[in-house]
Amino acid sequence: MLKEIHEQPEALRNTILPRLSGNLPDFTADGIPDELFLNCNQIRIIACGTAMHAGIVAKALMEPLLRIPVTVSIASEFRYEDPLVDEKTLAIVISQSGETIDTLAAMRLARSLGAPALSIVNVKGSTIARESDYVFYTHAGPEIAVASTKAYSVQLAALYMLCCRMALTRGCCNKAEAGQFMEDLLAVITAMETMIGRSDQ
């Protein structure tokens, strides 16, 4: 676990930097179009465990900035909620392994109701990645420890970047503000390295 904590700055760099064009988030290489963000009138975040907690943090950022409803559902309960989901709903599905059974079942339900699914996963070729409409691959590398560290950090970064791109696309912020959001995110890496460097203290 300690090893994986020390790997967090590199994992964040590997996840963030390839998706910056200048100082703005750009998902062209991921095949995630801006139209996806323009066409939704609500967001449903679906996940389990630590990934769900990343979703809770994202809701606190997204809802006030985007001014659309954001709901976080634990995947195992999503099927029993009779969810109000349609083609105007963006389903953001989070799973480190991409194989979480409850999350996969919830994603399948959301898609059957018409919602496009954007997954945030760490394992290429996983079932959730294959079955979702769009994929944001994090680059945390293998995570062996039971307690999630670097996978959680890159999930938060992915959600932050998605929120920033959505806000820019929907006119909720301008390029200067979006650029500042990204500078703030990159500053987290520097702060993290400073703290890790003091770990022997």
Predicted features and spans:
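Cofactor-/ligand-binding subdomain signature composed of acidic, glycine-rich
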Residues: 1-40, 161-199
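Short gly/ser/thr-rich secondary-structure transition/capping motifs
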Residues: 24-29, 71-77, 117-118, 197-200
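Glycine-rich phosphate-binding loops that contact phosphosugars or nucleotide phosphates
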Residues: 38-187
